[in-house]
């Protein structure tokens, strides 16, 4: 499947990534993206920036190197109450919020705790997508969580970096099963490179392959076209982004 949007990318501001926003934008252009989301780690991750960094994204131009820039964050799920490490004052300056588990912030517990944390995060209404769910350290009830995500219009991320098999080892088969459950429940799917270096921006081939193999309806893949992604943001309650009105 052709994918026009990369919804999960990092700059050096994350503390363990190595490129600037301009470098990422250039790579996005070279790889044929229409939009990309800049989603550095929120402040609870070691080395991550202060929340002002995210609030101040309002100064970013809407286009860099001819590619549309979506202002975002990869927030950390903090607890079973579904709290995330992002000041609520930042919300109105962002377009896109991923909620993810990371071991340094949320110590792996048990399936019930992970399931509760994900469901409460979804119900909290502040995250637009759940990131890299395949991690076996954070097992959860696939059916229960994805059904909740479907009800609340929260997208399920297919993470290309995970599918390479080098990080979150043991995730690949789980990613395929998560995708199959998402297909059966007609949930929304998003795709992210999780790039920590600019050469990986737009690297979505493994995610695209998974989508094709599982047979997910392109209309449920919000990154299939820029317009589908922007329509999803509006479905989530975001205001239309005037500068992107002409994107297809």
Swiss-Prot record:
Origin superkingdom:
Bacteria
The record's section on InterPro entries has: Phosphatase_YcdX_put (IPR023710), PHP_dom (IPR004013), PHP_phosphatase (IPR050243), Pol/His_phosphatase_N (IPR003141), Pol/histidinol_Pase-like (IPR016195)
Q: Which GO terms describe its cellular component?
A: cytosol
GO annotation (BP), single: bacterial-type flagellum-dependent swarming motility
- State where Zn(2+) 3 binds: 74, 102, 132
What does the record note about the cofactor? Binds 3 Zn(2+) ions per subunit.
Q: Which residues are involved in binding Zn(2+) 2?
A: 16, 41, 196
NCBIfam families (alphabetical): PRK09248.1
Please report the name of this protein according to its UniProt entry. Probable phosphatase VCM66_A0854
Q: Which organism is it from?
A: Vibrio cholerae serotype O1 (strain M66-2)
């Amino acid at each position: 499947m052709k994918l026009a949007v990369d919804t999960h990318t990092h700059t050096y501001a994350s503390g363990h990534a190595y490129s600037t926003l301009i470098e990422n934008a250039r790579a996005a252009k070279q790889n044929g993206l229409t939009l990309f989301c800049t989603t550095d780690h929120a402040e609870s991750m070691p080395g991550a920036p202060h929340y002002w960094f995210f609030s101040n994204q309002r100064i970013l131009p809407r286009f860099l190197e001819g590619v549309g820039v979506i202002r975002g964050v990869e927030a950390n799920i903090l607890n079973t109450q579904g709290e995330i490490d992002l000041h609520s004052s930042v919300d109105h300056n962002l377009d896109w919020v991923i909620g993810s588990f990371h071991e340094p912030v949320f110590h792996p517990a048990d399936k019930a705790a992970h399931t509760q944390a994900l469901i409460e995060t979804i119900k909290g209404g502040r995250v637009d997508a759940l990131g890299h769910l395949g991690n076996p350290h954070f097992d959860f009830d696939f059916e229960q969580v994805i059904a909740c995500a479907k009800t609340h219009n929260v997208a399920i991320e297919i993470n290309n970096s995970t599918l390479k098999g080098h990080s979150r080892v043991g995730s690949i088969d789980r990613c395929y099963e998560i995708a199959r459950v998402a297909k059966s429940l007609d949930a929304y799917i998003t795709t992210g490179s999780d790039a920590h270096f600019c050469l990986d921006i737009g690297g979505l081939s493994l995610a695209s392959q998974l989508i094709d193999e599982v047979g997910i309806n392109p209309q449920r893949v919000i990154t299939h076209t820029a317009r589908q992604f922007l329509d999803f943001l509006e479905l989530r309650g975001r205001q239309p982004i005037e500068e992107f009105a002409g994107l297809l």
